[in-house]
């Protein structure tokens, strides 16, 4: 299971990356401590269902994407998502179907991730920041935006901007602050998350 307090891992296997991208999709706009166990329940159930259907214990070791593709073929993905309470169901279903088509998450690009329904700039950057050491771009969440307002950028929005120009404008400000502090974007982001998530 993904530990929401320790998401940074630059040495994940393909299977672990698959679980992590599903986690990233699920927690968008939701509480990670609630969504992480739901994903675990979904993956366990998905493995059980596909293993029983194929009458093979080998499916118990299948990757998350293998299980999703098998559930799609069985016509049971939506059922298992409801069983695990992975809502909003239609949105998650579309995201899971699309993301399971990505062959290699170790080399996936930001633009390829953005083609998946339900993955925006924040989710894509979150995934890449916490799975690739060389990716040092901010994900503008409510905590970072609150931090920016506290730093005097009072025009920083309260929620993640959907306009790309606005997003990049505030992302660059945050990158500059991190550099001035001698920190990586990911490290400063984690510090801010720990500090601001306690106060909200």
Task: Explain the meaning of each model-derived region.
Residues 29-37, 49-53, 103, 134, ...:
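Amphipathic alpha-helical interaction segments
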Residues 14-46, 168:
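Extended cationic-aromatic binding surfaces that line active-site or macromolecule-binding grooves
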Residues 4-7, 19-27, 75-82:
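Glycine-/proline-rich flexible loop or hinge segments
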Residues 23, 27-30, 39, 67, ...:
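Generic hydrophobic/packing signal
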Residues 1-19, 89-100, 106-108, 115-200:
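C-terminal accessory module of base-excision DNA glycosylases/AP lyases that mediates lesion recognition
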Residues 44-117:
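Alpha-helical ds-nucleic-acid-binding substructure associated with the helix-hairpin-helix region
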């Amino acid at each position: 299971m993904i530990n929401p307090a320790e998401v940074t891992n630059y040495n994940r296997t393909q299977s672990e990356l698959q679980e992590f991208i599903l986690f990233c999709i699920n927690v968008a706009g939701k509480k990670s401590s609630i969504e992480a166990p739901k994903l675990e329940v979904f993956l366990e159930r998905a493995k059980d269902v596909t293993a029983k259907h194929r009458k093979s214990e080998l499916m118990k070791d299948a990757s998350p994407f293998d299980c999703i593709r098998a559930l799609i073929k069985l016509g049971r993905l939506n059922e298992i998502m409801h069983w695990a309470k992975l809502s909003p169901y239609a949105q998650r279903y579309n995201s899971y179907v699309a993301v399971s088509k990505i062959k290699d998450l170790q080399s996936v690009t930001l633009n390829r991730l953005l083609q998946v329904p339900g993955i925006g700039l924040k989710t894509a950057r979150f995934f890449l920041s916490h799975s690739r050491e060389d990716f040092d771009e901010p994900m503008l969440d409510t905590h970072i935006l609150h931090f920016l307002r506290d730093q005097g950028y009072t025009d920083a929005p309260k929620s993640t901007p959907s306009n790309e120009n606005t997003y990049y404008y505030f992302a660059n400000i945050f990158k500059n602050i991190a550099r001035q502090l001698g920190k990586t974007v990911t490290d400063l982001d984690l510090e801010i998350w720990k500090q601001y998530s306690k106060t909200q």
